[in-house]
């Protein structure tokens, strides 16, 4: 199979499997949200957010670093992957122990504190799985990771439905999460060892070298993901979220919409992840080729981004009702606001990876630090008065600031300002939007399917998308 076909195959299979995984995840969230209600789902979400902060600290950019290092000529893949994998697990174990200790100092219900203890195992499984993605991307076998995720999500959904039917309560739902995450890790580890014999490795001198290389990336990731997650922590604390009668319920309301955001931004992360080795390859020895790949990737992301944003703006209420039930209809305005953040995140994925490829992580870290400080300050200003609406608005403003700063850095580095070809996608999106608005009372699945057909048909007719351009991106 040629490189063109391999990349195209991986994109299609991974995207398809990822869509199935997202669907399973959203169905699972629907069952859980209906079973637990606003406050119970808020507790469930808070546990995941709290632990994700410690997972973020353990990330250290090792996933991106592994992809870059094993893509280099003459790389010792076994030593690199085994040591980075082991380093990630060791650091995470230390931080998860700290998380278990720290949670008891927060003013949360006891079920949240016990839940954190249970879910630490799931976070360990998912974190270990994530770092293995570098292997699948190097060998263009991301379909294996996608299959593992689908199976794991199916396990979790099946157990959740069973436990809800048996009315086993809150902690049983958390157990289903742990089992699903364990299944994903076991499968990913099995698949990864077919290409690289990953083992536990303790080359401390190499660990020191990796930590030195990873520090700028790690700092950037920590800053980025903290401002992604800290809003839920602020919402959960009554002395900050002073306008709320039930801060934990507000976390549930906010996270129903946020789960949609996390689901739909898979495409840019997956697509840009496959393009990253090419950007890294051409970043220094063929800058013109780098610019071409960068521009074509940006064009594809804009084409996908526009209908997503418009669709979420118009279908926010039926989407949140479908996922969480009418009890969560108050989440619709949150999703409408976050739809703009989704558009910015699409662009930010490409810009962030390009900064790493251009070896500008240290400057990038200052950008993410600025974003984190801005996010924390604005959250502390707006959450006390506007609760989850303030949190969502702050997320959009932060993404806008970070995106603009990344564009400036990239332009100064490669002496090239990218073209934002949005006019034709916007025209096609407007046609799609008019259809959805006119038939808004129709079945949501019909609206999504027909809307997508209308969008791409109009885009093709006005020559906003060409098959040759997509193939050209892959070839380059």
Predicted regions and their residues:
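Transmembrane helical elements of multi-pass membrane transporters/channels
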Residues: 10-25, 152, 176-180, 184-188, ...
């Amino acid at each position: 199979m040629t490189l063109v076909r391999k990349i195209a195959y991986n994109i299609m299979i991974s995207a398809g499997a990822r869509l199935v995984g997202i669907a399973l995840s959203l169905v699972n969230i629907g069952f859980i949200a209906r079973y637990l209600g606003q406050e119970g789902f808020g507790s469930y979400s808070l546990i995941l957010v709290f632990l994700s902060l410690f997972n973020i600290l353990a990330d250290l950019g090792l996933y991106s670093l592994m992809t870059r290092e094993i893509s280099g000529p003459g790389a010792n893949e076994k030593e690199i992957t085994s040591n980075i994998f082991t380093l990630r697990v060791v650091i995470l174990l230390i931080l998860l122990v700290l998380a278990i200790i720290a949670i008891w100092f927060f003013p949360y219900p006891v079920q949240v504190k016990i839940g954190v203890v249970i879910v630490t195992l799931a976070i360990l499984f998912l974190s270990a799985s994530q770092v293995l993605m570098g292997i699948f991307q190097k060998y263009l076998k991301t379909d294996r990771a996608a299959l593992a995720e689908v199976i794991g999500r199916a396990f979790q959904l099946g157990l959740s439905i069973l436990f809800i039917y048996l009315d086993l309560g809150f902690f049983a739902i958390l157990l289903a999460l742990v089992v699903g995450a364990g299944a994903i890790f076991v499968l990913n580890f099995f698949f990864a060892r077919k290409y690289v014999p990953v083992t536990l490795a303790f080359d401390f001198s190499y660990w020191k070298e990796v930590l030195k290389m990873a520090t700028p990336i790690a700092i950037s990731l920590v800053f980025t993901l903290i401002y992604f997650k800290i809003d839920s922590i602020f919402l959960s604390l009554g002395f900050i979220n002073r306008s709320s009668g039930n801060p934990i319920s507000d976390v549930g309301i906010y996270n129903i919409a946020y789960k949609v955001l996390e689901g739909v931004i898979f495409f840019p992360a997956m697509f840009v992840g496959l393009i990253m080795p090419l950007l890294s390859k051409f970043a220094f020895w063929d800058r013109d080729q780098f610019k071409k790949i960068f521009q074509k990737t940006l064009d594809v992301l804009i084409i996908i981004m526009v209908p997503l944003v418009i669709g979420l703006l118009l279908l926010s209420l039926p989407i949140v009702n479908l996922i969480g039930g009418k009890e969560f209809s108050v989440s619709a305005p949150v999703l409408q606001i976050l739809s703009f953040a989704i558009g910015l995140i699409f662009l930010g994925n490409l810009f962030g990876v390009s900064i790493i490829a251009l070896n500008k992580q240290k400057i990038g870290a200052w950008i993410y630090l600025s974003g984190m400080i801005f996010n924390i300050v604005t959250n502390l200003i707006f959450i006390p008065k506007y609760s989850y609406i303030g949190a969502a608005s702050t997320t959009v403003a932060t993404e806008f600031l970070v995106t603009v700063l990344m564009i400036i850095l990239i332009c100064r580095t490669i002496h090239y300002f990218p073209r934002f070809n949005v006019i034709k996608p916007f025209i096609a999106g407007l046609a799609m939007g008019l259809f959805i608005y006119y038939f808004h009372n129709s079945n949501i699945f019909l609206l999504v399917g027909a809307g997508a057909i209308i969008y791409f048909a109009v885009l093709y007719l006005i020559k906003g998308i060409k098959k040759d351009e997509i193939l050209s991106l892959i070839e380059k």
